[in-house]
Design a protein with these regions (language model features):
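Surface-exposed, active-site-proximal loop segments in enzymatic domains
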Residues: 14-32, 57-71, 149-159
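Conserved, mostly hydrophobic/aromatic
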Residues: 41, 49, 186-189
């Protein structure tokens, strides 16, 4: 790429393993692997590394090719469709408490007309395609992606914002010496969308969260 006047200086992303986020027994080993990856990137001249600390599910979309009137398409997030996925496909216990009554009414109406193909498309879009692209926990061809996804969610039972913040602080404290050695800036991707989903805590949603990250080390 340098022969074409370009320079490779940014990596997006270097994914953080789930066990690091929920504080699993193997997190120290995984953090060491992460530090080695950072060092290797640093030796290649990389100065900016993007990452995120979103539990289980990365950026969320309900449609990867939403059509618009001018003939273009884009990624799209429809909260009603996502709520339907949460309530009637995942069947997450207590999920109804996370949505206002008007939205629940829309979900009920949607349930009367949604086709099996549309349900499968939601599973493919929210679980398989997005997550397979981001971190490979779930991939095309997996027999029961919903079951796998539920198991991933189960690791976060009892993990609240405070616990997730502490796990993020632990991770950043461990990797910063490597970043300083190679002059690497860590660039955190904000939670997308910036609010709690699927009962999971989100800790990079606004300026208060960003201030906490900058002051936590």
């Amino acid at each position: 790429i340098e022969s074409h006047g370009l320079r490779w200086s940014v990596v997006e992303s270097l994914p953080v393993c789930e066990a690091v986020k929920y504080g699993g027994a193997e997190r120290d080993r995984l953090i060491e692997n992460y530090k080695n990856s950072l060092a290797n990137l640093g030796r290649c001249g990389i100065k900016t590394v993007c990452y995120n600390f979103m539990p289980v599910i990365d950026w969320i979309r309900t449609d990867l090719q939403h059509p618009w009137a001018d003939g273009t398409t884009s990624l799209y997030f429809d909260r009603t469709r996502f709520a339907y996925f949460d309530l009637h496909i995942l069947e997450r216990p207590g999920a109804e408490k996370d949505y206002p009554d008007p939205l629940l009414a829309k979900v009920e109406e949607m349930g009367k007309v949604i086709s099996e193909k549309e349900k499968n498309d939601l599973i493919e879009t929210i679980i398989v395609k997005t997550q397979g692209f981001v971190n490979g926990n779930i991939k095309e061809g997996d027999e029961n992606p919903v079951k796998i996804f539920k198991k991933l969610l189960s690791h976060y039972e009892g993990i609240d914002r405070a616990a997730l913040r502490e796990n993020m602080r632990y991770f950043l404290s461990a990797i910063m010496p490597v970043c300083e050695t190679f002059g690497i800036n860590m660039c955190v991707h904000p939670d997308d969308p910036p609010f709690q989903v699927l009962g999971l805590p989100r800790i990079v949603t606004d300026e208060v969260d960003i201030a906490w990250i900058l002051l936590s080390l």
